[in-house]
Design a protein with these regions (language model features):
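Helix-coil boundary and interhelical linker segments in multi-pass alpha-helical membrane proteins
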Residues: 28, 68-78, 132-139, 182-187
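Hydrophobic/aromatic-rich structural module bridging two neighboring secondary-structure elements via a short loop
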Residues: 48-95
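N-terminal membrane topogenic signal
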Residues: 1-14, 111-117
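Alpha-helical transmembrane segments of multi-pass integral membrane proteins
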Residues: 80-95, 111-132, 151-158
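Alpha-helical transmembrane segments
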Residues: 8-20, 37, 121-122
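C-terminal transmembrane-bundle signature of multipass membrane proteins
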Residues: 159, 163-216
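Membrane-helix interface "capping/anchor" motifs
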Residues: 46-58, 157-169
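Short, hydrophobic transmembrane alpha-helix segments
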Residues: 20-32, 49-51, 71-72
Length: 216
């Protein structure tokens, strides 16, 4: 079952994101690709926060746009991350559409505590593997780029499975990405991640409320 979408709230989100994107573009002279990435990014994450399946096609469009933006800024790990995100976006769309057992709605669940050990190990190993690759291609910030790439992939996998903790990882990732993008003169993207941070916090609160209702 697809969550009912509040069209008024969606329209407000779209209009505000377009207005903010145009304002930032006029101030920092960003290009139209970054503007389009900004708008689709805000709208896409809003749709995730309210658990609506249409977030996936919007997210796939956002991934394609930012693949080009990051390539232009020499953030090669972030560029390559978009390929992972596209594949994971297709998987997530399929998982949410298929649902749980007997094609019921996929429910929000939590990960066991021991999963955090595996997540930390995956972060360390993934960063260690990715770092020399990004450094070889003269990436702008190889360590942070690699660490955030691996963390984002983990968060996306948890999101696909509707694990509540995906929002915790996204919140940390967004906080670190903001100064990184400012340092690369991607002010619109940095502002986008500031908004995504707020939406991620809202998403965590919203999903927590839904989870408590399901567990009651």
């Amino acid at each position: 079952m697809t969550k009912k979408l509040n069209l008024l709230h969606l329209a407000i989100c779209i209009l505000l994101s377009i207005g903010a994107g145009l304002l930032i573009r006029s101030i920092y002279h960003g290009d139209w690709f970054e503007f389009a990435g900004f708008v689709t990014g805000v709208v896409g994450v809003y749709l995730v926060a309210v658990e609506h399946i249409i977030n996936w096609p919007v997210g796939l469009l956002n991934v394609a746009i930012y693949g080009y933006v990051f390539f232009s800024s020499r953030l090669f790990a972030d560029m390559s991350l978009q390929f992972f995100f596209f594949a994971l976006g297709v998987q997530g769309w399929w998982m949410w559409a298929r649902g749980g057992p007997n094609r019921t709605e996929l429910k929000i669940t939590r990960i066991p505590i021991l999963w955090w050990v595996g997540i930390v190990v995956a972060l360390v190993l993934g960063t260690a593997i990715y770092y020399p690759v990004i450094e070889h291609f003269n990436g702008a910030a190889p360590f942070l780029d690699s660490l955030l790439t691996v963390a984002s992939i983990i968060a996306q996998l948890l999101l696909n499975a509707k694990k509540l903790e995906n929002w915790i990882i996204w919140i940390v990732v967004d906080i670190v990405y903001i100064p990184l993008y400012i340092s690369r003169n991607l002010q619109s993207t940095a502002f986008l991640y500031s908004i995504l941070l707020l939406i991620a916090i809202s998403g965590l609160v919203n999903w927590m409320k839904t989870y408590k209702v399901l567990e009651a």
